[in-house]
């Protein structure tokens, strides 16, 4: 047990230590300063030339958003066409068939918005061709989209007064070529050395210890898993994600994959400080996020390593913790850490089944996604925190009787309205769709039965499964309580709607706020200016997040996770 805790501490320390140099490097990339990756410049110039892009052309926030939305619309059509026709495309040695239109819609939307919700199993639901040219392609593009959006906001924050926030296409390309691709190659090389498959052969016939023959799926897993983790995508190459021994073979690969989830979101927060030359602001934000993250780690690790009281009552020893739904090669501690790392970000990959975690662990996993602010997805995670900074600045300004200001710009009614809509959209979407699904389950059982029954668990946990699904969609996370039968018309379509609303409306609002503030006249700091880089303001922001985001979900948790915990 002590060794497991040491492993948890080592992984967290590694993330924090490496985030600092990576954050400095990311800031240099977006500012166009000299870096070791300048050798990629000729490749980037070819991309710009082929695509007809002028990387030096500045965009205002409306042009920036237009480019972002057009890009995503194009790739959505691309993905739909390939998924519904994959059975007739090459690189399909196992003969997997095409996806149905509703499943393809859900899959395409999910990967396009960086959620990677999977209502299919990777081995049988996709081919090698669509794994590479839909899934892996989307995992690079969507991660780079979020990073580009944050780069635009950083540029607007660094300028005193400007009408432009940079070039979306330039930020998108350098995010791929200079950040995501190099890190993916490093992680992929480690995975190959540890035994993750990388090839295009079909299923391999093996003889098990029991003497039975079994077909084991293979494929280019080592190419896809790194960006799955680094881009906070999370969509597993295999159906059970990183629980699978070929996707995550050893404790070393588990450490590397877990580190890969959080390293860029952490680094992006610090990059903000380097880019804007406001390191204290970045440290303040980083400190609040890290505190919330560590609270979750402590709760989940203690819950999972402490075992299940129901099993204790049977007189069964639980020296290794609550091992239901966990891999013996990884242990309860590493699984508990991963469950927090994957939910404080929008990653959603798993190395154990969240549906089998203790009730309080499940509550922490959901709360991380419902708050949706602690580190979050690459780029967009900090942008969610940015929304609450605007709200906290406005409230603080009213409390001291001064016009609210952030980084020398007045925060007025227009920005506040947008921030409020973005902040309230998240709980609204989750709770409304959970209520709809619960209503249908209770009052239209024939419809539910026609779709396979939906729930494997009734009562408190059944509500948790529905709540988790929509929470995961709204947070662009993609993990799930897998007791829910979600590959149905109802869940495919409703989850797709939640995914679209929860991805693009917040990004539009956050980029709009940054663009509007950037155009305003810069006001030099004075003795009466509210300092946003202090511990006091960090606590204020934390309280605002807790009140607006966390408390909105208390009633539904009282009926699900908390009630289940008290019933043990």
Curated annotation (Swiss-Prot):
InterPro entries: KdpA. GO terms for molecular function: P-type potassium transmembrane transporter activity; potassium ion binding. GO terms for biological process: potassium ion transmembrane transport. Keywords: Cell inner membrane, Cell membrane, Ion transport, Membrane, Potassium, Potassium transport, Transmembrane, Transmembrane helix, Transport. Its main location: membrane. It is a multi-pass membrane protein. One of its GO terms (cellular component) is plasma membrane. It is found in: Cell inner membrane. The chain crosses the membrane at residues 3-23, 64-84, 133-153, 179-199, 255-275, 281-301, 375-395, 418-438, 497-517, 536-556. Belongs to the KdpA family. Part of the high-affinity ATP-driven potassium transport (or Kdp) system, which catalyzes the hydrolysis of ATP coupled with the electrogenic transport of potassium into the cytoplasm. This subunit binds the periplasmic potassium ions and delivers the ions to the membrane domain of KdpB through an intramembrane tunnel. The system is composed of three essential subunits: KdpA, KdpB and KdpC. HAMAP family: KdpA (MF_00275). NCBIfam families: kdpA (TIGR00680). This is Potassium-transporting ATPase potassium-binding subunit. The lineage of its organism: Bacteria, Pseudomonadati, Bacteroidota, Bacteroidia, Bacteroidales. The gene is kdpA.
